[in-house]
Structure formats: C-alpha cells, structure tokens
C-alpha cells in the first residue's frame, strides 16, 4: 500500500493506493493522519479510489482517524467507489462520514 499527501488550500488530501488490510496499511494510515493532525492540518480528505479492498481492521482505522480529527475540531471526508463503497454502506458508515464519488466534489464540500 502507498500513501501520498498533497494540499489543496487548507485541505490535506491523503491519496491511498493498494489493498488495505490488517498489517497492510492500517497502521501507516493511522500514522500519517496523526502526523497531519499534529501539524495542525484538521481538514482531511481520504482518497480511497485506488483501494480495491478494505478489511474490518482498516475500516476501523478509518473510523478512528475520523474520531481523532473530530477531537481536534477537524473533519475527515472520504472518496470511495466500488467494493469499498459497498462495504461502507453495509457498515452504515454513511452515518459517520461525508462520502463522495470524486475528489473535486469532496473539495467543494469543504468550502461550503
């Protein structure tokens, strides 16, 4: 799994590529989000478009990232499609996250 961070205005876009499962990226995502929050970056967009699969441990870590950001007065939004979107729906995570189909829509929502 690969994680890259880029900035668009005040939003940190975390681009994740590859499979996310226990031991394969869940801790890397946690560490990267902690770094961002520690640096004062509290508007975070998780771009998971290039993640073909997430197991329950990885989903739990995404939820934990949301919780950490909220504790700092921040927000985490997600961009997902396909099987990952189905998994989020089954877990009813649409109640927790603002979910978008593309990065541009998510960025536009941050400036509302």
Predicted regions and their residues:
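STAS-typified acidic loop motif
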Residues: 2-31
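Amphipathic alpha-helical interaction surfaces in cytosolic regulatory modules
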Residues: 20-97
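Short acidic-hydrophobic, aromatic-tinged amphipathic segments that line or gate anion-handling sites
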Residues: 98-102
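A short, charged, amphipathic alpha-helix used as a generic interaction element across diverse proteins
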Residues: 110-112
